[in-house]
């Protein structure tokens, strides 16, 4: 088993533990005893993709609409361009507007053609770190907390991050 696959599987186990036992789990306390773990597509190396970054030089704050029809401030970091099955795609990448300048966390909200069928209808997220080489690992795509609990307010992927391809990787709908 590849090292990347082992890391993803370990990440999934830790997430299940968090959702099952942590006080801050998004699974409502009254239904947590029924929670048997999250559902995922099998790991697929096809969806661990090297991407080219196109930086955006702007301090403009973007107000991302949330599931509660409020706004959360983000700064556009740039775009990641990548290829799946010979076709090129592009996703906007964001930084939270309220974090420290040295925070290297990047946020990629997206939808694909599995959204609303096999995966959460409002979309999924991927977190990556700033680096000189970028890899998007869709095997780590996850549903926002509002997929499990309506009390959460989650950013909705902007239209520019709606992909016209099936991403059969990462987290699936919880049944």
What is the meaning of each model-derived region?
Residues 1-59:
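N-terminal domain-onset segments
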Residues 5, 133, 142-175:
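Extended, aromatic/histidine-rich regions of cofactor-dependent oxidoreductases associated
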Residues 30-35, 58-76, 90-93, 155-163:
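Extracellular/lumen-exposed scaffold segments
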Residues 34, 43, 74-76, 120-122, ...:
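Residues that act as N-cap/strand-start positions at coil-to-secondary-structure junctions
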Residues 35, 49, 55-64, 71-74, ...:
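Surface-exposed peri-terminal alpha-helical interaction modules
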Residues 45, 76-78, 102-106, 132-134, ...:
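A generic structural signal for short beta-strands and their flanking turns/coil linkers
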Residues 64-121:
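Mid-length scaffold segments of soluble, non-membrane domains
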Residues 109-142:
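Acidic, glycine-rich flexible loop segments
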């Amino acid at each position: 088993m590849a090292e990347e696959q082992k890391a993803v599987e370990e990440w999934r186990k830790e997430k299940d533990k968090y959702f099952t036992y942590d006080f801050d789990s998004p699974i409502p306390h009254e239904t947590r005893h029924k929670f048997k773990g999250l559902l995922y597509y099998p790991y697929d190396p096809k969806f661990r993709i090297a991407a080219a970054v196109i930086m955006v030089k702007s301090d403009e704050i973007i107000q991302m609409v949330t599931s509660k029809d409020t706004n959360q401030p983000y700064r556009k970091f740039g775009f990641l361009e990548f290829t799946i099955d010979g076709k090129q795609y592009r996703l906007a990448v964001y930084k939270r507007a309220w974090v420290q300048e040295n925070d290297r966390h990047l946020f990629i909200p997206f939808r694909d053609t599995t959204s609303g069928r096999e995966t959460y209808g409002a979309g999924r997220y991927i977190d990556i770190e700033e680096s000189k080489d970028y890899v998007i690992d869709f095997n780590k795509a996850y549903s926002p907390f509002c997929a499990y609990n309506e009390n959460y307010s989650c950013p909705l992927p902007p239209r520019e991050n709606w992909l016209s391809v099936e991403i059969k990787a990462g987290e699936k709908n919880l049944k």
